[in-house]
């Protein structure tokens, strides 16, 4: 499974959305109807899965699925 597929699977599971709705340019708030609690839980799950911490400032900048994928690519060991 690719990084993109892993991230999308986590988003589908955490937000309870359809896999077809999760695209690289999908906005968590506008397209996937996530609220701040959803986003906090999503960040915690991503941190656990990919074994690194996402700072609060960085988390606020992660607005789309693509933002998350790019962030993980840049911060993985």
From Swiss-Prot:
Residues 1-76 form the Carrier domain. Pathway: Lipid metabolism; fatty acid biosynthesis. InterPro entries: ACP, ACP-like_sf, PP-bd_ACP, Ppantetheine_attach_site. One of its GO terms (biological process) is lipid A biosynthetic process. Transmembrane segments: none annotated. GO terms for molecular function: acyl binding; acyl carrier activity. 4'-phosphopantetheine is transferred from CoA to a specific serine of apo-ACP by AcpS. This modification is essential for activity because fatty acids are bound in thioester linkage to the sulfhydryl of the prosthetic group. It comes from the Bacteria. The keyword Methyltransferase does not apply. Keywords: Cytoplasm, Fatty acid biosynthesis, Fatty acid metabolism, Lipid biosynthesis, Lipid metabolism, Phosphopantetheine, Phosphoprotein. GO terms for cellular component: cytosol; membrane. It is found in: Cytoplasm. The modification O-(pantetheine 4'-phosphoryl)serine is found at residue 36. Carrier of the growing fatty acid chain in fatty acid biosynthesis. Belongs to the acyl carrier protein (ACP) family. NCBIfam families: acyl_carrier (TIGR00517), PRK00982.1-2 (NF002148), PRK00982.1-4 (NF002150). This is Acyl carrier protein. It comes from Chlamydia trachomatis serovar L2 (strain ATCC VR-902B / DSM 19102 / 434/Bu). The gene is acpP.
């Amino acid at each position: 499974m690719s990084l993109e597929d892993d991230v999308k699977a986590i988003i589908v599971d955490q937000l309870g959305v359809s896999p077809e709705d999760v695209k690289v340019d999908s906005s968590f708030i506008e397209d996937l109807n996530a609220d701040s609690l959803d986003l906090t839980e999503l960040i915690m799950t991503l941190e656990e899965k990919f074994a690194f911490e996402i700072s609060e400032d960085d988390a606020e900048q992660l607005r789309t699925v693509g933002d998350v994928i790019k962030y993980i690519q840049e911060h993985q060991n």
